[in-house]
Design a protein with these regions (language model features):
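Conserved non-cysteine loop/helix-boundary elements of the Radical SAM core domain that shape
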Residues: 17-169
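Auxiliary Fe-S-binding modules of radical SAM enzymes
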Residues: 9, 153, 160-233
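Low-complexity, highly charged intrinsically disordered N-terminal segments
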Residues: 10-14
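Alpha/beta catalytic barrel-like cores
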Residues: 1-4, 9
Length: 233
């Protein structure tokens, strides 16, 4: 399909769904090779991947850059060390800061993924995460409120009463706040809420949490309502 001709669109090969830079180097090279060839031939305009901050040592960043990766998205989730530990993320705040610094030094485009609603989060910790992300100056951010999925430790904690999921109204309010805050700092928020799927729409595998197929629209509606209300007050 790529070889059928170019248009004025921006074409990109993306490797999502896991921590790309953490898989064996030979596997990375095997899938990057055809993408890099297409990039060199002008058939695509860029390559991006998603990964975790503690899998972005200098040698990892150099490898990605040498194989044509132009954008890296990092699963940050929170900048609160206690929350990250409770979620068993395996990384900490400093790992994020270091990873972003290395990517910036190499001139790569940086995206950060944030998950409001993790266990232990408070309004104060959410605001502190928002400020920390602003200070890192990424090129863009994605906001994914936590959903409780079947057959996970979080589902067990939810059923045991040890975790309380965000309501839809809470998640929309958080999303509106974060988007307002980051966009005021000229940081683009390119997505709020998970991409709708047939499984999620039918509730399959979803135990709890603020899923809505039009979550992004709900956030935008909230932002506009708040602006109008502020003008009326």
């Amino acid at each position: 399909y790529i070889g059928s001709g170019r248009t004025d669109k921006y074409w990109e090969v993306a490797f999502y769904g896991g921590s790309f830079s953490a898989i064996p180097r030979a596997w990375q090279e095997a899938v990057l090779a055809p993408a890099y060839e297409a990039l060199l031939e002008g058939k695509i305009d860029g390559i991006r991947c998603s990964t975790r901050p503690d899998a972005l040592a200098l040698e990892d960043v150099d490898f990605l850059l040498e194989h044509g990766v132009t954008t890296v998205e990092i699963g940050v989730q929170s900048m609160d060390n206690q929350i990250l530990q409770m979620a068993n993320r395996g990384h900490n705040r400093q790992d994020v800061i270091d990873a972003v610094g290395r990517l910036k030094e190499k001139g790569m485009t940086i995206g950060l993924q944030i998950m409001p609603g993790l266990a232990g989060e408070t309004w104060t910790s959410l605001v502190e995460t928002a400020v920390a992300i602003k200070d890192l100056r990424p090129d863009f951010v994605r906001i994914y409120p936590v959903l409780v999925i079947e057959n996970t430790d979080l589902a067990d904690a939810y059923r045991a009463g040890d975790y309380q999921a965000l309501t839809l109204d809470q998640a929309v309010a958080y999303g509106a706040f974060l988007k307002d805050y980051w966009e005021a700092a000229d940081i683009e928020v390119i997505r709020t809420g998970l991409q709708a799927t047939r499984e999620l729409d039918q509730g399959r595998g979803l135990v709890a949490g603020p899923y809505h197929p039009s979550f992004g629209e709900l956030v935008e509606n909230k932002r506009w309502r708040d602006r109008i209300q502020s003008l009326m007050d």
